[in-house]
C-alpha cells in the first residue's frame, strides 16, 4: 500500500500546502518537510513562515529550512530521513543530482501545465495569455533539467473565458493533490507508466515581470483581454496616465474595426472606456488608480473624466 511509503515533502507557498494537506489527510507517511526560510513580509517586514511550514508544524512534522541543498551537510539531512520518495511542489530551490537520486523511487514534482507545454516558472499565466483551451497538472519524475523528466500522470481542465490566473490556480490546486495521490499509489504498486516528453512540443513559461504587464496597445484586443486575466492577481496589467500607474482588473473585447491609432480613446461612458488596439477595441471595465481600491469605469470617470477624453491617446 502507498501509505507505507516514507515521503519527504518539499514545498513553500499555499499551492504546495494544499498538496501536503491532502497527503496527510489520506494517511500518507510524511517523514520530513523541506520549505524555504522564513521571509520578511508585510509593512513591518516581520519574518513570516511559509504556508507549508505553518501546516507542517501544526501537524508536528520535522521541518527543515536550508537556504540551499548544495552543501553536503544539507544533503545529509535528506539522506538521514531514508525516504522512499520525495514530493516537490513549488519548493523554489534547485535539487542537485545527488538529492534527486537519494530516495529509492526518486523525486516527483507536481507541475501546473500539461507538459511538455509550458515548462518553467509561470505555466498558469502563460497558458491563459496564449489562449489555450485547456491546461492541467502533470506529475513527473524529476531529473536535472527544467521540467524535462518523464511524465507519470496527467489531469486536465478547461480554461474558460472568465478564468484569471487566480481562478485557474485554485482549479489546479484541486487537481494536483488528486493526481499526486494516484501517482504515489502507482509508484508503490509498481504500476506507474513513465512517458517520455515529446521535445517537438515543448514551450517555455518564462517568469513574469511588472514591466511585461504594461499594456501594449499595438497588440490585439483579444490578446490584451487575455493578458489582463493572465496577470490577475499578479503582477496586474497596468497603463500609465499622467505619470500614474493604473491597474486594469477587467476588460472585454468589442469586435468592431477601427482605423484609429492603437491607444486612442474612442468612447468613455457608463458602458466602459473603449480604446483602439492593434486589432479591435478593448473596453476597460474595472480599474484601480494608485492608492485607491478597484472601481468600475463609471466610478473612475465620475472622478477622473479628464483622463479619458475621446481622441486622446493612452501610451
Curated annotation (Swiss-Prot):
| Entry's Gene Ontology BP terms | charged-tRNA amino acid modification; conversion of methionyl-tRNA to N-formyl-methionyl-tRNA
Coiled-coil regions listed in the entry: none
Q: Which reaction does it catalyse?
A: L-methionyl-tRNA(fMet) + (6R)-10-formyltetrahydrofolate = N-formyl-L-methionyl-tRNA(fMet) + (6S)-5,6,7,8-tetrahydrofolate + H(+)
Q: PROSITE patterns this protein is in?
A: GART (PS00373)
Provide the E.C. number(s) assigned to this enzyme.
2.1.2.9
Activity regulation information from UniProt: Activity is optimum in the presence of Mg(2+) and K(+).
Name the residues that bind (6S)-5,6,7,8-tetrahydrofolate.
Answer: 113-116
Task: Give yes or no: UniProt keyword Protein biosynthesis.
Answer: yes
SUPFAM superfamilies under this entry?
FMT C-terminal domain-like, Formyltransferase
**GO molecular function terms here?**
methionyl-tRNA formyltransferase activity
Residue ranges, annotated region (C-terminal domain):
210-315
- Pfam short name (any one): Formyl_trans_N
Cite the entry's keywords alphabetically: Protein biosynthesis, Transferase
- The top EC class is transferase
According to the lineage, what is the superkingdom?
Bacteria
Where is the stretch described as N-terminal domain? 2-189
GO CC, one annotated term: cytosol
Its domain description in UniProt is: Composed of an N- and a C-terminal domain. The N-terminal domain carries the tetrahydrofolate (THF)-binding site and the C-terminal domain is presumably involved in positioning the Met-tRNA substrate for the formylation reaction.
Could you describe the subunit structure of this protein?
A: Monomer.
Q: What does this protein do?
A: Attaches a formyl group to the free amino group of methionyl-tRNA(fMet). The formyl group appears to play a dual role in the initiator identity of N-formylmethionyl-tRNA by promoting its recognition by IF2 and preventing the misappropriation of this tRNA by the elongation apparatus.
Task: Report the sequence similarity comment from the record.
Answer: Belongs to the Fmt family.
Name of the featured protein: Methionyl-tRNA formyltransferase
Task: Tell me the gene name.
Answer: fmt
Amino acid at each position: 500500500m502507498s501509505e507505507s511509503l516514507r515521503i519527504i515533502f518539499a514545498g513553500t507557498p499555499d499551492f504546495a500546502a494544499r498538496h501536503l494537506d491532502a497527503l496527510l489527510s489520506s494517511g500518507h507517511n510524511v517523514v520530513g518537510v523541506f520549505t524555504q526560510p522564513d521571509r520578511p513580509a508585510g509593512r513591518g517586514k516581520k519574518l513570516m513562515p511559509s504556508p507549508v511550514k505553518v501546516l507542517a508544524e501544526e501537524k508536528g512534522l520535522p521541518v527543515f529550512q536550508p537556504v540551499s541543498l548544495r552543501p553536503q551537510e544539507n544533503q545529509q539531512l535528506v539522506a538521514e530521513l531514508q525516504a522512499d520518495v520525495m514530493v516537490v511542489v513549488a519548493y523554489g530551490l534547485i535539487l542537485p543530482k545527488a538529492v534527486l537520486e537519494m530516495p529509492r523511487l526518486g523525486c516527483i514534482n507536481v507541475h501546473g501545465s500539461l507538459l511538455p507545454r509550458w515548462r518553467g516558472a509561470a505555466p498558469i499565466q502563460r497558458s491563459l495569455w496564449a489562449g489555450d483551451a485547456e491546461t492541467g497538472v502533470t506529475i513527473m519524475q524529476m531529473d536535472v533539467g527544467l521540467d524535462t523528466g518523464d511524465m507519470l500522470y496527467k489531469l486536465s481542465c478547461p480554461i474558460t473565458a472568465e478564468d484569471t490566473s487566480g481562478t485557474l490556480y485554485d482549479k489546479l490546486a484541486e487537481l494536483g493533490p488528486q493526481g499526486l495521490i494516484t501517482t504515489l499509489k502507482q509508484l508503490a504498486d509498481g504500476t506507474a507508466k513513465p512517458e517520455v516528453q515529446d521535445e517537438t512540443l515543448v514551450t517555455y513559461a518564462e517568469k513574469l515581470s511588472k514591466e511585461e504587464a504594461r499594456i501594449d496597445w499595438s497588440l490585439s484586443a483579444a490578446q490584451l483581454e487575455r493578458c489582463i486575466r493572465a496577470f490577475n492577481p499578479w503582477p496586474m496589467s497596468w497603463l500609465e496616465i499622467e505619470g500614474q500607474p493604473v491597474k486594469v482588473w477587467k476588460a472585454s473585447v468589442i469586435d468592431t474595426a477601427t482605423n484609429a491609432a492603437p491607444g486612442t480613446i474612442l468612447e468613455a461612458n457608463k458602458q466602459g472606456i473603449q480604446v483602439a488596439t492593434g486589432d479591435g477595441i478593448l473596453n476597460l471595465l474595472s480599474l484601480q488608480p494608485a492608492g485607491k481600491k478597484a472601481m468600475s469605469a463609471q466610478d473612475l470617470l465620475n472622478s477622473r473624466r479628464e483622463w479619458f477624453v475621446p481622441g486622446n491617446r493612452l501610451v
